[in-house]
C-alpha cells in the first residue's frame, strides 16, 4: 500500500498568490495561458502544462517546491510533483 503524500498533507493552505491576476512570467512577456497553478510554498502563480510555457512545472524544477494548487475558480485540488499524486 502506498503511503499518503506528506508534502500535500503539510502544504500551507494560506499561501497568498504573488500575482493574483495571472501567470507571473506570462504577464511579463505578454503570453497567454490555459489554466493557472499556485505554488503553496512561495505563492508563485504559473501556467499549467497545457499552456505553451508550462511555467508552474518550470518553477518546480527550478525551486523544488513540491506542491501546487489549482488557481482556477471552484477548484481545490492539489498536485505533488515529487510523489506524482493528487490531493485535496
Where are these regions (language model features)?
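Cys/His-rich, Zn2+-coordinating zinc-finger modules
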Residues: 3-22, 29, 45-88
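Canonical RING-type zinc finger of E3 ubiquitin-protein ligases
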Residues: 31-40
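Short cysteine-rich clusters marking metal-coordination/redox-active sites
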Residues: 23-26, 39
